[in-house]
Amino acid sequence: MAASAATATATAAAVGAGEVISVHSLEQWTMQIEEANAAKKLVVIDFTASWCGPCRIMAPIFADLAKKFPAAVFLKVDVDELKPIAEQFSVEAMPTFLFMKEGDVKDRVVGAIKEELTTKVGLHAAQ
């Protein structure tokens, strides 16, 4: 039974590799963060909103970064849908990109700044 659960977890992790995972519940958020922490993976979070124009501009760039850095976990959180998570990390402007590793916030990028986001993903993914 434990082997099946481990296989299911490994399969789920592999499915998300190279893709942006949209988080729609606190339970899903907790599961994604716990799995990434256990695997000591970099987590890059895009705090976004459906009404945010710059967020829509950054979405394909964020998706490309997820493909280029499949060892990291890329999460997308709608601040209106999951307000408690946005508040927990003091997100006040969109887009805000947060970099976490083993439960600690390592860095952030506030705004639609492609060059800074790309540079910081490369920097933190290498650590």
Curated annotation (Swiss-Prot):
InterPro entries assigned: Thioredoxin-like_sf (IPR036249), Thioredoxin_CS (IPR017937), Thioredoxin_domain (IPR013766), Thioredoxin_H-type-like (IPR050620)
Annotated active site: C52 (nucleophile), C55 (nucleophile)
Keyword annotations from UniProtKB, A to Z: Cytoplasm, Disulfide bond, Electron transport, Redox-active center, Transport
UniProt GO cellular component terms: cytoplasm
Keyword Aminoacyl-tRNA synthetase among record annotations: no
Site (Contributes to redox potential value): G53, P54
Domain Thioredoxin: 2-127
PROSITE patterns given in the database record: THIOREDOXIN_1 (PS00194), THIOREDOXIN_2 (PS51352)
Protein's cellular compartments: Cytoplasm
Site feature (Deprotonates C-terminal active site Cys) residues: D46
A Pfam family this chain is assigned to: Thioredoxin
Disulfide bonds: C52-C55
Family note: Belongs to the thioredoxin family. Plant H-type subfamily.
Functional summary from the UniProt entry: Participates in various redox reactions through the reversible oxidation of the active center dithiol to a disulfide. The H form is known to activate a number of cytosolic enzymes.
Protein name listed in UniProt: Thioredoxin H-type
Organism, as annotated: Triticum aestivum (Wheat)
Top-level taxonomy: Eukaryota, Viridiplantae, Streptophyta, Embryophyta, Tracheophyta
